[in-house]
Amino acid sequence: MKRSLAFGVIAGVGLLGGAALLIVGQSAVSPDAIQSSVTRAPALIDSAWKLPVAATFNADLAWQSNGSRCGPASLANTFRSIGEEETTEAEVLEGTGKCWTGYCIIGLTPDELADVAQAKTGRKVSVLRNLSADEFREHMKRANDPGRRYIINFTRETIFGAGGGHFSPVGGYLEAEDMVFVLDVNERYKPWLVERERLFSAMDTVDSDGDKKRGLLLIE
């Protein structure tokens, strides 16, 4: 019994240690890159917060509790914007068996996050991947529809020059500027705007934890 307990403790420490290493590895984006790689012009950010969907977030995001829980944090913020009851990471994850250590050890795939979402809402949840650039543009145009919510899975490396995969809600689309408003749930980044084509390129990549491409979650 003692040996089994010891093995269990060692395994748990190993999992948490692995999670810590993963988080450190994904935090290699410099403060300068965080600021300069995307658009943060106050006037444009202010306009973006006034978009129909972004406005439902009330310019207030609950930041992810650690570097591995961007998916649950994105769901919690999105659910709050549409009036669902589960509006914290803990409530989103309760009963799902996911991230039970407090960390999502290797992160969640879009399919896994969709399963978590569907377990907590009566709304339809879809995973959209293998989109063409034109299809992505059409979805971004619909990202201002109050009846729809998008969560995007992308790699930071394409946009910021370093970093790993990440989830964040889409706050909307400034069509005249052809820019997407990303409600980044990581407090180091905070919400930002980026050219649609660059965001598509960051999404149109293969998830390192599987053999499928990243994509969008659509909740409607």
Predicted segments — roles?
Residues 1-4:
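Positively charged n-region of N-terminal signal peptides that target proteins for export
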Residues 25-37, 52-54, 94-219:
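Conserved active-site-adjacent core of cysteine acyl-enzyme catalytic domains
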